[in-house]
Amino acid sequence: MTRKQAALSTRLKRLGFTQGNQMRLYGEIFEFVSEPIIITDNVVLVDATDKKTGQMRRVRVPLPIVSMAIQGLNAA
């Protein structure tokens, strides 16, 4: 993991994408069971459990949130 990716992961965790947190994404409520998984600078995934079905899924962090996190890194 590069330094930039590590910083992005930390920023996303501060935004709530961390193990044990719940969030509504794509119209569904998920509970995260992993830390952010950075594939590329713009593709970030997180393992999560769908609260409605209990099914485990790998969910993509929405691009606007990733972009906002990257902008926050560039401003700092």
PLM feature segments, named:
Residues 39-49:
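Short, solvent-exposed secondary-structure boundary/capping segments
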Residues 2, 53-76:
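Intrinsically disordered, low-complexity, charged/polar segments
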Residues 19-20, 44:
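Short, hydrophobic/aromatic-rich segments at coil-to-beta transitions
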Residues 23-24:
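Hydrophobic beta-strand signal
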Residues 33, 49-52:
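Intrinsically disordered, low-complexity regions of eukaryotic proteins
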Residues 28-37:
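Short beta-strand-centered aromatic/proline hotspots
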Residues 1-19:
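Mixed-charge, Lys/Arg-rich low-complexity intrinsically disordered regions
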